[in-house]
Protein backbone atom coordinates (compact mmCIF):
# COMPACT_ATOMS: atom_id res chain seq x y z
CA UNK A 1 0.00 0.00 0.00
CA UNK A 2 2.86 2.37 0.90
CA UNK A 3 4.53 1.71 -2.44
CA UNK A 4 1.36 2.33 -4.43
CA UNK A 5 0.83 5.64 -2.62
CA UNK A 6 4.42 6.65 -3.33
CA UNK A 7 4.08 5.74 -7.02
CA UNK A 8 0.85 7.70 -7.24
CA UNK A 9 2.53 10.71 -5.67
CA UNK A 10 5.41 10.48 -8.15
CA UNK A 11 2.96 10.28 -11.05
CA UNK A 12 1.16 13.40 -9.82
CA UNK A 13 4.47 15.24 -9.37
CA UNK A 14 5.58 14.23 -12.85
CA UNK A 15 2.32 15.44 -14.35
CA UNK A 16 2.54 18.74 -12.49
CA UNK A 17 6.18 19.13 -13.54
CA UNK A 18 5.30 18.47 -17.16
CA UNK A 19 2.66 21.20 -17.22
CA UNK A 20 5.08 24.12 -16.68
CA UNK A 21 7.34 22.70 -19.40
CA UNK A 22 4.42 22.50 -21.82
CA UNK A 23 3.29 26.01 -20.87
CA UNK A 24 6.81 27.41 -21.35
CA UNK A 25 7.15 25.67 -24.71
CA UNK A 26 3.81 27.06 -25.87
CA UNK A 27 4.79 30.53 -24.63
CA UNK A 28 8.09 30.46 -26.52
CA UNK A 29 6.36 29.33 -29.72
CA UNK A 30 3.71 32.05 -29.32
CA UNK A 31 6.41 34.70 -28.86
CA UNK A 32 8.23 33.50 -31.97
CA UNK A 33 5.01 33.70 -33.99
CA UNK A 34 4.28 37.21 -32.69
CA UNK A 35 7.85 38.23 -33.52
CA UNK A 36 7.20 37.03 -37.05
CA UNK A 37 4.55 39.73 -37.46
CA UNK A 38 6.61 42.53 -35.86
CA UNK A 39 7.83 44.13 -39.13
CA UNK A 40 4.22 44.85 -40.11
CA UNK A 41 3.94 47.17 -37.10
CA UNK A 42 7.33 48.90 -37.28
CA UNK A 43 7.48 49.28 -41.09
CA UNK A 44 4.27 50.92 -42.35
CA UNK A 45 5.51 50.72 -45.95
CA UNK A 46 5.79 46.92 -45.77
CA UNK A 47 2.90 45.32 -47.63
CA UNK A 48 1.26 42.59 -45.59
CA UNK A 49 0.50 40.31 -48.55
CA UNK A 50 4.08 39.77 -49.82
CA UNK A 51 5.39 39.66 -46.25
CA UNK A 52 2.95 36.96 -45.16
CA UNK A 53 3.69 34.96 -48.31
CA UNK A 54 7.40 35.26 -47.52
CA UNK A 55 6.78 33.96 -43.99
CA UNK A 56 4.69 31.07 -45.29
CA UNK A 57 7.37 30.15 -47.82
CA UNK A 58 10.09 30.07 -45.18
CA UNK A 59 7.84 28.22 -42.74
CA UNK A 60 7.11 25.60 -45.40
CA UNK A 61 10.81 25.14 -46.10
CA UNK A 62 11.61 24.96 -42.39
CA UNK A 63 8.93 22.29 -41.88
CA UNK A 64 10.32 20.38 -44.86
CA UNK A 65 13.82 20.61 -43.37
CA UNK A 66 12.51 19.29 -40.05
CA UNK A 67 10.75 16.42 -41.84
CA UNK A 68 13.95 15.52 -43.69
CA UNK A 69 15.92 15.45 -40.46
CA UNK A 70 13.28 13.29 -38.74
CA UNK A 71 13.24 10.97 -41.75
CA UNK A 72 17.01 10.58 -41.60
CA UNK A 73 16.77 9.94 -37.85
CA UNK A 74 14.07 7.33 -38.40
CA UNK A 75 16.23 5.57 -40.98
CA UNK A 76 19.16 5.60 -38.55
CA UNK A 77 16.90 4.07 -35.88
CA UNK A 78 15.77 1.30 -38.23
CA UNK A 79 19.38 0.43 -39.06
CA UNK A 80 20.34 0.54 -35.39
CA UNK A 81 22.74 3.46 -35.76
CA UNK A 82 20.87 5.89 -33.50
CA UNK A 83 18.09 6.20 -30.96
CA UNK A 84 14.85 8.01 -31.65
CA UNK A 85 14.30 11.61 -30.50
CA UNK A 86 13.12 12.07 -26.93
CA UNK A 87 10.28 14.35 -25.82
CA UNK A 88 12.67 17.24 -25.21
CA UNK A 89 14.03 17.01 -28.76
CA UNK A 90 10.52 16.99 -30.22
CA UNK A 91 9.68 20.21 -28.39
CA UNK A 92 12.97 21.76 -29.45
CA UNK A 93 12.30 20.77 -33.06
CA UNK A 94 9.03 22.73 -33.16
CA UNK A 95 10.82 25.76 -31.76
CA UNK A 96 13.71 25.35 -34.22
CA UNK A 97 11.34 25.18 -37.20
CA UNK A 98 9.51 28.37 -36.20
CA UNK A 99 12.76 30.16 -35.28
CA UNK A 100 14.22 29.27 -38.70
CA UNK A 101 11.21 30.66 -40.56
CA UNK A 102 10.94 33.84 -38.47
CA UNK A 103 14.68 34.59 -38.50
CA UNK A 104 15.16 34.16 -42.24
CA UNK A 105 12.01 36.07 -43.23
CA UNK A 106 13.06 38.99 -40.99
CA UNK A 107 16.56 38.89 -42.44
CA UNK A 108 15.17 39.10 -45.97
CA UNK A 109 13.02 42.11 -45.04
CA UNK A 110 16.08 43.86 -43.61
CA UNK A 111 18.38 42.94 -46.48
CA UNK A 112 15.95 43.87 -49.25
CA UNK A 113 14.09 46.88 -47.83
CA UNK A 114 16.35 48.44 -45.19
CA UNK A 115 19.97 47.74 -46.15
CA UNK A 116 19.82 49.36 -49.65
CA UNK A 117 19.29 52.73 -47.94
CA UNK A 118 22.80 52.43 -46.48
CA UNK A 119 24.47 52.22 -49.88
CA UNK A 120 27.92 50.66 -50.37
CA UNK A 121 30.47 53.13 -48.97
CA UNK A 122 33.28 50.70 -48.09
CA UNK A 123 33.97 48.73 -51.29
CA UNK A 124 36.66 51.04 -52.63
CA UNK A 125 38.51 51.05 -49.29
CA UNK A 126 38.33 47.27 -48.84
CA UNK A 127 39.43 46.57 -52.41
CA UNK A 128 42.37 48.98 -52.14
CA UNK A 129 43.56 47.60 -48.79
CA UNK A 130 43.46 44.00 -50.01
CA UNK A 131 45.28 44.97 -53.21
CA UNK A 132 48.07 46.49 -51.12
CA UNK A 133 48.24 43.61 -48.63
CA UNK A 134 48.46 41.07 -51.46
CA UNK A 135 51.43 42.88 -53.07
CA UNK A 136 49.52 44.30 -56.02
CA UNK A 137 47.16 41.37 -56.59
CA UNK A 138 43.44 41.10 -56.01
CA UNK A 139 42.34 38.10 -53.94
CA UNK A 140 40.46 36.54 -56.87
CA UNK A 141 43.69 36.54 -58.93
CA UNK A 142 45.35 34.34 -56.30
CA UNK A 143 42.52 31.78 -56.31
CA UNK A 144 42.37 31.75 -60.11
CA UNK A 145 46.12 31.10 -60.28
CA UNK A 146 45.61 28.07 -58.04
CA UNK A 147 42.13 26.83 -59.03
CA UNK A 148 41.40 28.62 -62.30
CA UNK A 149 40.71 25.49 -64.39
CA UNK A 150 37.14 24.43 -65.16
CA UNK A 151 36.87 21.41 -62.82
CA UNK A 152 38.10 23.16 -59.64
CA UNK A 153 35.84 26.12 -60.42
CA UNK A 154 32.79 23.88 -60.82
CA UNK A 155 33.63 22.09 -57.55
CA UNK A 156 33.87 25.43 -55.74
CA UNK A 157 30.67 26.64 -57.39
CA UNK A 158 28.78 23.50 -56.33
CA UNK A 159 30.11 23.65 -52.77
CA UNK A 160 28.92 27.25 -52.52
CA UNK A 161 25.44 26.35 -53.78
CA UNK A 162 25.12 23.38 -51.38
CA UNK A 163 25.60 25.81 -48.46
CA UNK A 164 21.96 26.95 -48.75
CA UNK A 165 20.24 23.62 -47.90
CA UNK A 166 22.80 22.91 -45.16
CA UNK A 167 22.04 26.30 -43.62
CA UNK A 168 18.30 25.54 -43.67
CA UNK A 169 18.79 22.09 -42.17
CA UNK A 170 21.23 23.16 -39.46
CA UNK A 171 18.85 24.13 -36.60
CA UNK A 172 16.69 21.01 -37.02
CA UNK A 173 19.74 18.77 -37.45
CA UNK A 174 21.34 20.17 -34.30
CA UNK A 175 18.18 19.54 -32.27
CA UNK A 176 18.08 15.87 -33.31
CA UNK A 177 21.81 15.11 -33.42
CA UNK A 178 22.94 16.85 -30.21
CA UNK A 179 21.69 15.27 -26.97
CA UNK A 180 23.24 17.82 -24.62
CA UNK A 181 20.58 20.51 -24.16
CA UNK A 182 23.17 23.13 -23.23
CA UNK A 183 25.19 22.60 -26.42
CA UNK A 184 21.99 22.31 -28.45
CA UNK A 185 20.74 25.63 -27.11
CA UNK A 186 24.07 27.33 -27.77
CA UNK A 187 24.17 26.16 -31.39
CA UNK A 188 20.58 27.09 -32.24
CA UNK A 189 20.87 30.38 -30.34
CA UNK A 190 24.12 31.28 -32.09
CA UNK A 191 22.53 30.45 -35.46
CA UNK A 192 19.65 32.86 -34.76
CA UNK A 193 21.74 35.65 -33.22
CA UNK A 194 24.31 35.52 -36.05
CA UNK A 195 21.68 36.62 -38.57
CA UNK A 196 21.00 39.66 -36.40
CA UNK A 197 24.51 40.67 -35.34
CA UNK A 198 26.58 39.49 -38.31
CA UNK A 199 24.14 39.37 -41.22
CA UNK A 200 22.17 42.51 -40.36
CA UNK A 201 23.99 44.89 -37.99
CA UNK A 202 27.40 43.87 -39.30
CA UNK A 203 26.26 44.31 -42.89
CA UNK A 204 24.90 47.77 -42.06
CA UNK A 205 28.07 48.92 -40.34
CA UNK A 206 30.41 47.48 -43.01
CA UNK A 207 28.16 48.06 -46.02
CA UNK A 208 29.73 46.76 -49.23
CA UNK A 209 28.54 45.09 -52.42
CA UNK A 210 31.44 42.79 -53.28
CA UNK A 211 33.75 42.38 -56.29
CA UNK A 212 31.09 40.95 -58.63
CA UNK A 213 29.00 44.15 -58.33
CA UNK A 214 31.85 46.67 -58.11
CA UNK A 215 31.69 47.94 -61.69
CA UNK A 216 27.90 48.18 -61.71
CA UNK A 217 27.29 49.68 -58.28
CA UNK A 218 30.55 51.34 -57.20
CA UNK A 219 32.66 52.43 -60.15
CA UNK A 220 35.13 51.22 -62.78
CA UNK A 221 37.65 48.61 -61.64
CA UNK A 222 39.79 46.90 -64.29
CA UNK A 223 40.68 43.97 -62.04
CA UNK A 224 37.07 42.99 -61.45
CA UNK A 225 36.30 43.34 -65.15
CA UNK A 226 38.99 40.72 -65.79
CA UNK A 227 37.53 38.53 -63.05
CA UNK A 228 34.08 38.62 -64.65
CA UNK A 229 35.55 37.88 -68.08
CA UNK A 230 37.49 34.89 -66.69
CA UNK A 231 34.33 33.48 -65.10
CA UNK A 232 32.37 34.03 -68.32
CA UNK A 233 34.98 32.06 -70.27
CA UNK A 234 34.72 29.22 -67.75
CA UNK A 235 30.93 29.34 -68.03
CA UNK A 236 31.17 29.00 -71.81
CA UNK A 237 33.49 26.00 -71.43
CA UNK A 238 31.09 24.43 -68.93
CA UNK A 239 28.22 24.86 -71.40
CA UNK A 240 29.96 22.38 -73.72
CA UNK A 241 29.24 19.70 -71.11
CA UNK A 242 25.74 20.95 -70.37
CA UNK A 243 26.87 22.70 -67.18
CA UNK A 244 27.28 26.29 -66.03
CA UNK A 245 28.88 28.46 -63.38
CA UNK A 246 25.80 28.91 -61.20
CA UNK A 247 27.23 31.91 -59.35
CA UNK A 248 27.08 34.07 -62.48
CA UNK A 249 23.36 33.46 -62.89
CA UNK A 250 22.59 34.01 -59.19
CA UNK A 251 24.59 37.23 -59.23
CA UNK A 252 22.60 38.54 -62.17
CA UNK A 253 19.33 37.53 -60.51
CA UNK A 254 20.22 39.45 -57.34
CA UNK A 255 21.33 42.46 -59.36
CA UNK A 256 18.04 42.57 -61.27
CA UNK A 257 15.96 42.32 -58.08
CA UNK A 258 17.96 44.95 -56.16
CA UNK A 259 15.66 47.77 -55.11
CA UNK A 260 12.55 45.87 -56.22
CA UNK A 261 9.62 44.46 -54.24
CA UNK A 262 10.01 41.89 -51.47
CA UNK A 263 10.78 38.45 -52.90
CA UNK A 264 11.87 35.09 -51.51
CA UNK A 265 15.63 35.64 -51.73
CA UNK A 266 17.36 38.83 -52.74
CA UNK A 267 19.59 41.62 -51.45
CA UNK A 268 23.26 42.46 -51.92
CA UNK A 269 25.78 42.49 -49.07
CA UNK A 270 29.44 41.45 -48.88
CA UNK A 271 31.09 42.22 -45.53
CA UNK A 272 30.98 40.29 -43.29
CA UNK A 273 30.35 37.07 -45.21
CA UNK A 274 27.40 35.13 -43.81
CA UNK A 275 28.36 32.20 -46.02
CA UNK A 276 31.73 31.86 -44.28
CA UNK A 277 30.33 32.79 -40.86
CA UNK A 278 27.64 30.11 -41.11
CA UNK A 279 30.13 27.56 -42.49
CA UNK A 280 32.20 28.26 -39.37
CA UNK A 281 29.17 27.41 -37.23
CA UNK A 282 28.76 24.19 -39.26
CA UNK A 283 32.31 23.27 -38.25
CA UNK A 284 31.66 24.09 -34.59
CA UNK A 285 28.43 22.07 -34.57
CA UNK A 286 30.00 19.13 -36.38
CA UNK A 287 32.85 18.93 -33.85
CA UNK A 288 30.27 18.85 -31.04
CA UNK A 289 28.86 15.67 -32.61
CA UNK A 290 31.95 13.92 -33.92
CA UNK A 291 35.61 14.81 -34.39
CA UNK A 292 35.67 13.00 -37.74
CA UNK A 293 32.62 14.86 -39.09
CA UNK A 294 34.09 18.07 -37.69
CA UNK A 295 37.20 17.76 -39.86
CA UNK A 296 35.05 17.06 -42.92
CA UNK A 297 33.15 20.28 -42.29
CA UNK A 298 36.39 22.15 -41.67
CA UNK A 299 37.44 21.22 -45.21
CA UNK A 300 34.04 22.31 -46.48
CA UNK A 301 34.36 25.62 -44.65
CA UNK A 302 37.69 26.27 -46.35
CA UNK A 303 36.05 25.53 -49.72
CA UNK A 304 33.33 28.07 -48.96
CA UNK A 305 35.88 30.79 -48.17
CA UNK A 306 37.90 30.09 -51.31
CA UNK A 307 34.74 29.89 -53.43
CA UNK A 308 33.45 33.19 -52.06
CA UNK A 309 36.60 34.87 -53.41
CA UNK A 310 36.99 32.79 -56.57
CA UNK A 311 33.43 33.43 -57.78
CA UNK A 312 33.51 37.15 -57.02
CA UNK A 313 30.97 37.18 -54.22
CA UNK A 314 33.34 38.45 -51.54
CA UNK A 315 36.64 40.08 -50.73
CA UNK A 316 39.01 37.78 -48.82
CA UNK A 317 38.58 39.82 -45.64
CA UNK A 318 34.78 39.36 -45.71
CA UNK A 319 35.14 35.68 -44.92
CA UNK A 320 37.90 36.13 -42.35
CA UNK A 321 35.82 38.68 -40.46
CA UNK A 322 32.67 36.56 -40.71
CA UNK A 323 34.48 33.53 -39.28
CA UNK A 324 36.02 35.58 -36.47
CA UNK A 325 32.64 37.08 -35.53
CA UNK A 326 30.99 33.65 -35.46
CA UNK A 327 33.75 32.22 -33.26
CA UNK A 328 33.25 35.21 -30.97
CA UNK A 329 29.50 34.60 -30.76
CA UNK A 330 30.09 30.93 -29.96
CA UNK A 331 32.53 31.87 -27.20
CA UNK A 332 30.04 34.32 -25.69
CA UNK A 333 27.25 31.74 -25.87
CA UNK A 334 29.05 29.61 -23.25
CA UNK A 335 28.77 31.95 -20.24
CA UNK A 336 25.42 33.22 -21.52
CA UNK A 337 24.04 29.69 -21.57
CA UNK A 338 25.39 28.92 -18.10
CA UNK A 339 23.78 32.09 -16.77
CA UNK A 340 20.41 31.21 -18.29
CA UNK A 341 20.45 27.60 -17.11
CA UNK A 342 21.58 28.56 -13.60
CA UNK A 343 18.68 31.01 -13.41
CA UNK A 344 16.20 28.40 -14.59
CA UNK A 345 17.62 25.84 -12.17
CA UNK A 346 17.35 28.26 -9.26
CA UNK A 347 13.79 29.09 -10.23
CA UNK A 348 12.91 25.39 -10.45
CA UNK A 349 14.43 24.67 -7.03
CA UNK A 350 12.52 27.57 -5.51
CA UNK A 351 9.25 26.16 -6.83
CA UNK A 352 9.95 22.64 -5.56
CA UNK A 353 11.15 23.78 -2.10
CA UNK A 354 8.47 22.89 0.48
CA UNK A 355 6.76 25.81 2.17
CA UNK A 356 7.03 26.12 5.94
Where in the sequence are the language-model features?
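Juxtamembrane "helix-exit" motif on the non-cytosolic side of transmembrane helices
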Residues: 38-49, 75-79
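Membrane-interfacial catalytic/cofactor-binding modules of polytopic membrane enzymes
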Residues: 205-288
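Intramembrane catalytic core of multi-pass membrane enzymes that act on lipidic substrates
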Residues: 90-161
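N-terminal membrane topogenic signal
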Residues: 13-31
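Membrane-embedded catalytic cores of phosphoryl/pyrophosphoryl-handling enzymes
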Residues: 250-352, 356
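Interfacial segments of alpha-helical transmembrane regions
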Residues: 92-97, 172-207, 212-226
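Loop-to-helix transition at the N-terminal end of transmembrane alpha-helices
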Residues: 48-66
Amino acid sequence: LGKSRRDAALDIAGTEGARPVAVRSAAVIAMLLLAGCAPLFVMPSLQSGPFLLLNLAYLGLAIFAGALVLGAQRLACITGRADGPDESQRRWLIGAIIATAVTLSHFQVFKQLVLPGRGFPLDALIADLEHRLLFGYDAWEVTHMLFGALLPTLILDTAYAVWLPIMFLFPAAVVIAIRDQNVRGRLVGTWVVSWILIGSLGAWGLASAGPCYFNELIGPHAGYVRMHEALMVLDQHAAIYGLNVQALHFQEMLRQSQGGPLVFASGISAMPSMHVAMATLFVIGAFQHSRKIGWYFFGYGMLIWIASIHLGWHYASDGLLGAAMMIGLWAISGPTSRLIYSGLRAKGLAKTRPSV
